[in-house]
Amino acid sequence: MSRINANDLNLTDRVVHISRVAKVVKGGRRFSFSALVVVGDASGHVGYGLGKANEVPEAIRKGVEQAKKNLIKVPVNQNQSIPYEIIGRFGAGRILMKPASPGTGVIAGGAARAIFEAAGISNILSKCLGSNNPHNVVKAAFEGLRLLKTPEELTARRGLAE
């Protein structure tokens, strides 16, 4: 699969989660921050990244850079939904994603909602099964969306092409 060039896309970023972590040293605690960021162009391209730094803005910037290197293309149908139901898995995190009819909206938790909105999916039903950790939810949703194929790809793969 060829790499998607982020410079050709009009990407917007959303911070999903910021956490403060502490390293215990002889003189006390040294704090730093990690930021989980999702980027997307609202027309099928989405990526996520994790940035770590001593300051929050720098961690977000690093997360955005990482996310731009980690872009995938999601097949979004004419209903602004996914073509079929799928379960994304990562670690203990599992997320069930179901296509929805027009007008349903994004029915998803915070971390998954960010990915769907960044990808331009505006009608979807989802449920987090297992871990609710934002890192696992984002990675599971991303993995599920990465495995989606268009109906044309499926018919060609099954040898049903007309």
Swiss-Prot record:
Keyword list, A-Z: Ribonucleoprotein, Ribosomal protein, RNA-binding, rRNA-binding
Q: One GO molecular function term?
A: structural constituent of ribosome
Protein name per its UniProtKB record: Small ribosomal subunit protein uS5
Q: Which InterPro entries match?
A: Ribosomal_Su5_D2-typ_SF, Ribosomal_uS5, Ribosomal_uS5_bac-type, Ribosomal_uS5_C, Ribosomal_uS5_N, Ribosomal_uS5_N_CS, Ribsml_uS5_D2-typ_fold_subgr
Cite the Pfam families for this sequence: Ribosomal_S5 (PF00333), Ribosomal_S5_C (PF03719)
- Which HAMAP family does the protein's record reference? Ribosomal_uS5_B
Its GO biological process annotations read: translation
Which branch of life, at top level? Bacteria
Q: Which GO terms describe its cellular component?
A: small ribosomal subunit
Question: Which family does the record assign?
Answer: Belongs to the universal ribosomal protein uS5 family.
What does the entry's free-text domain comment contain? The N-terminal domain interacts with the head of the 30S subunit; the C-terminal domain interacts with the body and contacts protein S4. The interaction surface between S4 and S5 is involved in control of translational fidelity.
Oligomer status and interactors = Part of the 30S ribosomal subunit. Contacts proteins S4 and S8.
Described function: With S4 and S12 plays an important role in translational accuracy. Located at the back of the 30S subunit body where it stabilizes the conformation of the head with respect to the body.
Span of domain S5 DRBM:
11-74
